[in-house]
Amino acid sequence: MYSPSRRGKVRLLCALLAAVLLAFTVPALRTGAGRADALSRSACISEELYSGTVLQESNADVALPMASTTKIMTALLICEDCDLDRVVIVPDCAVGVEGSSIYLKKGEEIDVRDLLYGLMLRSGNDSATALAVIHSGSVDKFTDDMNARALELGAKSTHFTNPSGLPDDDHYTTARDLCAIARAAMQNDIFRKVVGTKNWNGAYRSYSNKNKMLYNYDGATGVKTGYTMKAGRCLVSSAMRGGMEIVTVVLNEYDMYGKSAALLDYGFENYEVAVLPVSRVFLCGGRLCSPGAEGRIVLRKGS
């Protein structure tokens, strides 16, 4: 079981704050006509990975369900906090979970690494449940940790009720929030390696990746597909070309691969990253900060 660290205590405080905020906030997804209107929309955003510079967006602040792209947050917490080489016994509650599955068996031994790859390559809902229990002791406690981590990342219009993305009226995000979560995840070396893997042969399981972008888009680096009837087709993608990496989110988009490719194409065709040496950076009050650092800015090509 995950032992609370100083960051864990911070997450607990964030979770309590989230509960207070939810008592006074009603996102578009959760209100009668507003909810129906939101669910009929698609949303998208594209951002440069490191700076968060927005390249394109549409309905990026509309609250929507996100299906299995939820697992980006689940995986991030596992990558940050768990020993991937630890061998565990599959918890009973992870056997026979609804939806996509890696077909875990009662009493089965498996390491956390194979569960993580099963989560992100095969979208196993049973794997998500097992990892939640391994990390936090229970699914409910894990969702508290997910919500706290979302707040730490500035995803204030996001709320998780489960680690897999199964439909629930109180389980939602926005394209902007999900992009912030994905950008943080893609800067974690372990996460990045997992979602960029096409085929995995582990100690206990072998998987192929469902994400077609890895096979069909030049420079693709990740990250996660998702689908439920309620959420529609959802995809978080990332790709790198010419020293620039872009992350895109599309929610409730029938042609999720085509839309993601179009967002990436637009970004690479119209923007570039400039890395500028910054010898003297001053803060308010005249205090010198970070001499010799490099400044990273996103520029429109030809500007």
What role is predicted for each listed range?
Residues M1-R35:
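Gram-positive cell-envelope targeting signals
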Residues R11-L12, S68, G219:
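Hydrophobic alpha-helical transmembrane segments of integral membrane proteins
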Residues A155-H159, P167-S303:
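Domain-terminus/edge residues, biased toward the C-terminal soluble/receptor-binding domains
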Residues A28-R176, R183-Q187:
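Active-site-adjacent loops and short helices of periplasmic peptidoglycan-processing enzymes
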